[in-house]
């Protein structure tokens, strides 16, 4: 089956925004315009009509949230048909993991900002992640019809807060209730959308006289930005003082794909204005899969391999999201980087060393779910039938193994005990939590061995609240939750050369004998537990080495100070002894546990606590109080910036344990006018008095 759309006409983009910037409306409008211009029935057999209202009544719109495909031929039907895959990204900081994994598979992103609220802390987090994956971006300033809307203020904020280089390609005509359209700086014409056709129709008009000078000034800046793309363009611009429309488009596209600039648009999705122009920009300025560097990975011998984005290469894809669907079971969303995948094919997962068969392949077209028989390079689709895949794992051709760079998921920083409201729900709760943990790698579930309680762990209070809410909504399980607890860790500061562990039971009959000598030393932060086998001359037989490692892995789950997990320790097994008859795996496992605990006690054990990056936005009058309060919570204030719209943005690092209930304090301190965001930064050694209090609390 030949591909319908050449890969050069693919655009894989994300729409990303702060919570209230109007991302959902923007996405809906995109599907609305593309849906009307492209009846799916034309391309595939069986006419598929789109009934928009029906979709809104059902909960269909959430199903489309992971990835939706639509088609666009341009606002004036002047392009060849392009296929746009839209990947949804959440706006809340507790779900940075979601943003991170969608950024990993995007080729470009459209950042939506509110014309009133501007650039907010969440927007910064998303921007940083887009920088990390070098994702080209364009910006859309939404809600131009709202009171207080100011397009140029948002341009300034992007420069100041995001260190971005926005290049407005349009400027608004009017603002607030007088917002009627935009001036297109490329064509130097006003675009006025027709209200009656919900913005499907529009007119080009002359630029209103009062805006002409402003439009010329911004056009000059746009042409200048385009000219910097190459020496050739720059010379022409310096000689002639202008560039042609095609040259400007070429310059802007080149620099956008290189992440040097961000084309900027504005409108009101709710009032059907401006979204169509932004869609044109996606086609004109966002990269196709072949415009960006090919994907890199490792083969089974850990040699670097590169896969070009075309159908003749061997198949490779990344699973970036799992969802449970009430009708088809588990959906695994994948981004295909190279090759072709047909339904019924087997794929190999190099992380787990397993082959699996693809049952069905499904693509979302706005509100239509469509089964397809194959997917090709550049596609995004959901596979049904994969049992053992989690987010961030590679799927590839079993005959040509490649392991794409894995996503690194942060360790949870907060835990809560959870129990079902009725005993009947116990089993249902277990299944629900397991499912949710599969979908979200930053959420963990475990059982506390002493109390038998089920513990859930995540990235923040809101993260866990939403998990509990989803259990109720999607699985019908009501649960009570305990008070949030901080996820402390333990580590060591000194090296112990000879930590000895012996496990001997010899009282007639078959006994037990295991003896190990370990070197225990601090490892680099973030490196985790490393086990090195340095046994010479068989003093500990080969077959018992895995048992020693198993013992170490068991021992690190509970540290010597307060029973918290131990991190960042290097353990080297370098000596030991055995008994011909009495030695067995269990004896060596126990010896390793004793040796490790003994070594840790001598190695200067310390407790680590999670530090959070906190940012508070507050009116100036309360800034002093806010800073004083953060300091009283053992916080280190790292700086204060002026916000473009007045007020101060205060950045600090504060231990998580001091931040519970902070929102209530902040509300009363600022009469409800200050807001804050918080995300995990790193673990650091807890001060002595804090460590002692933690140990005392655990000893009770």
From Swiss-Prot:
UniProt GO BP = ribosome disassembly
**What superkingdom does the record give?**
Bacteria
Q: Which SUPFAM superfamilies match?
A: EF-G C-terminal domain-like, P-loop containing nucleoside triphosphate hydrolases, Ribosomal protein S5 domain 2-like, Translation proteins
Q: Name one GO molecular function term.
A: GTPase activity
State the InterPro entries in the record. Answer: EFG_II, EFG_III, EFG_III/V, EFG_IV, EFG_V, EFG_V-like, EFTu-like_2, G_TR_CS
Looking up PROSITE patterns in the UniProt record yields: G_TR_1, G_TR_2
* Gene3D superfamilies tied to this protein: 3.30.230.10, 3.30.70.240, Elongation Factor G (Translational Gtpase), domain 3 (3.30.70.870), P-loop containing nucleotide triphosphate hydrolases (3.40.50.300), Translation factors (2.40.30.10)
Report the locations given in the UniProt record. Answer: Cytoplasm
Q: What keywords tag this UniProt record?
A: Cytoplasm, Elongation factor, GTP-binding, Nucleotide-binding, Protein biosynthesis
Q: Which residues form the tr-type G domain?
A: 8-290
Please provide, in alphabetical order, the Gene Ontology terms of the cellular component aspect for this entry. cytoplasm
Pfam family membership, one: GTP_EFTU_D2
Q: Which HAMAP family match?
A: EF_G_EF_2_B (MF_00054_B)
What the record says about family reads:
Belongs to the TRAFAC class translation factor GTPase superfamily. Classic translation factor GTPase family. EF-G/EF-2 subfamily.
Protein role: Catalyzes the GTP-dependent ribosomal translocation step during translation elongation. During this step, the ribosome changes from the pre-translocational (PRE) to the post-translocational (POST) state as the newly formed A-site-bound peptidyl-tRNA and P-site-bound deacylated tRNA move to the P and E sites, respectively. Catalyzes the coordinated movement of the two tRNA molecules, the mRNA and conformational changes in the ribosome.
The identity of this protein, by name, is: Elongation factor G
Q: What's the source species for this entry? A: Albidiferax ferrireducens (strain ATCC BAA-621 / DSM 15236 / T118)
This protein's gene is called: fusA
